[in-house]
Amino acid sequence: MPPYTVVYFPVRGRCAALRMLLADQGQSWKEEVVTMETWQEGSLKASCLYGQLPKFQDGDLTLYQSNTFLRHLGRTLGLYGKDQREAALVDMVNDGVEDLRCKYLSLIYTNYEAGKDDYVKALPGQLKPFETLLSQNQGGKTFIVGDQISFADYNLLDLLLIHEVLAPGCLDAFPLLSAYVARLSARPKLKAFLASPEHVNLPINGNGKQ
């Protein structure tokens, strides 16, 4: 039985980066899909620490909060930089990803029709820091931090992919980010996962937007 279990709704949502990481690292995991009917019944929600999903199980360790999953696997699988300096930079990148993801989710779930145009107009300013970070690391030819992949790379990749769906061409002005997405997406195990029905057939969000 796989040591890892993902408990979540039938969406990519806040587990897409986690699944990318697991797939790319050659890990197996079990999915426990929660329907809205089951969730609205209430007993599962009441059992969750913060009253929300996703939930992640690593053996007898139960975790909540999607970024906690990534950091845990970063430590477990050696995806947290090669030293404390790189680990600090990985944390900084991941926090920046979370900031933009929260803005994206606010748009998707609360203001999509009225707010999309303004969001897309402001998007270059939100993406520029990641282009800058790439430019400062070996000319943008490797990863977002250092010379080995980290959990922040998977989170950033997912963020960029969903924004390419929201605003096609949004990376055209960012050559390093564009090349980064292409390079990471071409990693054999990750490429196979991104093309798999398990990924492709899931909506990005739970409300029909994207």
From Swiss-Prot:
Gene3D superfamilies: 1.20.1050.10, Glutaredoxin. The modification N6-acetyllysine is found at K128. Glutathione binds at Y8, R14, W39, K45, Q52, L53, Q65, S66. It catalyses: RX + glutathione = an S-substituted glutathione + a halide anion + H(+); prostaglandin J2 + glutathione = prostaglandin J2-S-(R)-glutathione; prostaglandin J2 + glutathione = prostaglandin J2-S-(S)-glutathione; prostaglandin A2 + glutathione = prostaglandin A2-S-(S)-glutathione. PROSITE patterns: GST_CTER, GST_NTER. SUPFAM superfamilies: GST C-terminal domain-like, Thioredoxin-like. Residues 2-81 form the GST N-terminal domain. It is found in: Cytoplasm; Mitochondrion; Nucleus. The modification Phosphothreonine is found at T62. One of its GO terms (cellular component) is cytosol. The keyword Lipid metabolism applies. It is an enzyme of class 2 (transferase). Its EC number is 2.5.1.18. The modification N6-succinyllysine is found at K103, K116. Keywords: Acetylation, Cytoplasm, Lipid metabolism, Mitochondrion, Nucleus, Phosphoprotein, Transferase. GO terms for biological process: glutathione derivative biosynthetic process; glutathione metabolic process; hepoxilin biosynthetic process; prostaglandin metabolic process; xenobiotic metabolic process. Residues 83-204 form the GST C-terminal domain. The keyword Transmembrane does not apply. Homodimer. Interacts with CDK5. Belongs to the GST superfamily. Pi family. Conjugation of reduced glutathione to a wide number of exogenous and endogenous hydrophobic electrophiles. Involved in the formation of glutathione conjugates of both prostaglandin A2 (PGA2) and prostaglandin J2 (PGJ2). Participates in the formation of novel hepoxilin regioisomers. Negatively regulates CDK5 activity via p25/p35 translocation to prevent neurodegeneration. This is Glutathione S-transferase P.
